[in-house]
Structures are given as structure tokens and as C-alpha cells.
A protein has these predicted regions:
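Active-site neighborhood of divalent metal-dependent phosphoester/pyrophosphate hydrolases
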Residues: 45-58
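Active-site regions of metal-assisted phosphoester/phosphodiester hydrolases
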Residues: 1-41, 62, 68-69, 73, ...
Length: 254
């Protein structure tokens, strides 16, 4: 494996369709902040694919879908899962990547048309020849309500059990809405999947609301790699952008 491919970095970020907690449209500022960090992957939740009313009303609204607008300078490869569909448009999850995708599938977990709940599962290959490694990327957004989330967690664990071989590295991140912290234990005990921030700090990151974080809803999970860095991006500009704070982690191949 080439030296520059011995580690991978990712950010997970619920961008609230480009709006701040106070409903200001700050997508350009979000993009610039993400560009300064330059990770290998960006996992986005609540990314707007289209909104015909807002694009007419908001001067700074981009001509391209939000995921393309964010990706265009650094991440040549991107996937978008259109999960929440309504009269004026749609939103969902996205993965931006510096590496081409080998395959992908979106598992829609939404119980309502306007709710964006899904598992966007993609695969990339790192390295060349005999050193090539297949890496699984899962961008996740789960529901707000306990019963809904319990069913979605079961579907998530089943998906991993059936579709991700144990010998292939897995990186999974997103907005799990798991403020009661029920998910990490079964993931670790049943599937050998650990959470990056918890592994480094001994506790989950408080990422919501961004202005005064109190709830641990966003996570970065991994298996088959070693976490070397994990951060919750606090302070300026992050606390003034989306209603969530982003998480950043770096992993090394074992």
C-alpha cells in the first residue's frame, strides 16, 4: 500500500439544509469551513437536493444541488440519497469522496415522506494490486422517536451483518439521534464496531444544539481500522453555522 493511503479521514455533518439554528442561510460559509479541513470523506445529513421555492427566494442559493456545491472544489465523487420528498423538492443524505465509488445502495428507513431516514451504503477501494482494500462507508440518519429508532437500529445491524464482511474495514457516521446512548453497546458487543470519540475520550461527543451542545446524537463508528484522532468541531465558525456540530476523525489501516 502506498504511504499516502495508510490513513483515511472523515467528517460527519448534519447541515440542516444549509440553515443555522436561527434560520439564516449559511451554506457558503459551511462549504468554506469544510474546505479548510480537507478530509477524504464528508458524510452529510439533511442536505437539500432541490427546493424550488427557496432557490427563487434566497439570493445565495446555489445553482447546483447542495452536495454538488460543497463537493466541487475537492471531492470529485459524490452520492446522494433522496429520502424526503415533497412538493417543492427533496432532501436526504450524501457522501462526498476523494476516491471513486465501486458500488452503492440506499436503504430508506423513513416512515414519513418528509422525514429523511436512511442508510447510504457505499464501497471504495484503497491501494493497488495485491494491497487493494475494500472499504465500506455508511452514512446514517435515524429517527427522533424511540420506537422508530429501535426498528431502524435493528435494520442497520442486520444490514451490516449481511452486507459487510468482517475482514473488510467499515466507517459509519451520521446523525443517529441516540441521545440516550443505547446503540454503541450492541454495536460493539454483537458486531465489533466501536465509536471513534468514545474510543479516544471515554465518552461520546456532545454535538447538538451547536450553540450550546448538550446531546450526543452524532457519531463516527469504525471496524477493522485504528482511530488516531477524533474531534468535535466547536467554537467559531461551527457553532454559528448548522444546528449540529460536525465530528472529525482519522483512521489508520491495521
Amino acid at each position: 500500500m502506498q504511504k499516502q493511503q495508510r490513513s483515511l479521514s472523515l467528517i460527519t455533518y448534519n447541515i440542516h439544509k444549509g440553515f443555522s439554528f436561527s434560520k439564516r442561510f449559511l451554506l457558503p460559509q459551511m462549504r468554506e469551513a469544510l474546505l479548510t479541513l480537507n478530509p477524504d470523506f464528508v458524510f452529510l445529513q439533511e442536505v437539500q437536493g432541490e427546493h424550488r421555492l427557496r432557490e427563487k427566494r434566497i439570493v445565495a442559493w446555489p445553482d447546483a444541488p447542495q452536495f454538488e456545491y460543497i463537493a466541487e472544489k475537492i471531492w470529485p465523487h459524490y452520492l446522494y440519497a433522496k429520502n424526503a420528498i415533497y412538493h417543492s423538492g427533496h432532501h436526504g443524505n450524501a457522501i462526498l469522496s476523494k476516491y471513486p465509488f465501486e458500488r452503492f445502495e440506499n436503504i430508506n428507513l423513513s416512515s414519513m415522506n418528509r422525514a429523511s431516514r436512511s442508510i447510504l451504503h457505499s464501497q471504495i477501494k484503497i491501494g493497488e494490486g495485491l494491497n487493494q482494500i475494500n472499504v465500506h462507508l455508511l452514512c446514517v440518519h435515524l429517527g427522533l422517536f424511540k420506537a422508530e429508532r429501535s426498528s431502524q437500529c435493528s435494520a442497520l445491524m442486520q444490514r451490516i451483518s449481511e452486507a459487510v464482511p468482517e475482514h473488510e474495514p467499515l466507517l459509519m457516521a451520521g446523525d443517529f439521534n441516540d441521545w440516550r446512548r443505547h446503540l454503541s453497546k450492541p454495536l460493539a458487543e454483537e458486531l465489533g464496531i466501536n465509536e471513534a470519540f468514545y474510543s479516544m475520550k471515554g465518552h461520546h461527543a456532545r454535538s447538538f444544539p451547536a450553540i450550546k451542545p448538550a446531546f450526543c446524537v452524532d457519531r463516527i463508528y469504525f471496524r477493522g481500522m485504528r482511530v488516531s484522532e477524533a474531534y468535535c468541531l466547536k467554537g467559531k465558525p461551527w457553532r454559528m453555522l448548522s444546528d449540529h456540530l460536525p465530528l472529525l476523525a482519522r483512521f489508520e489501516f491495521i
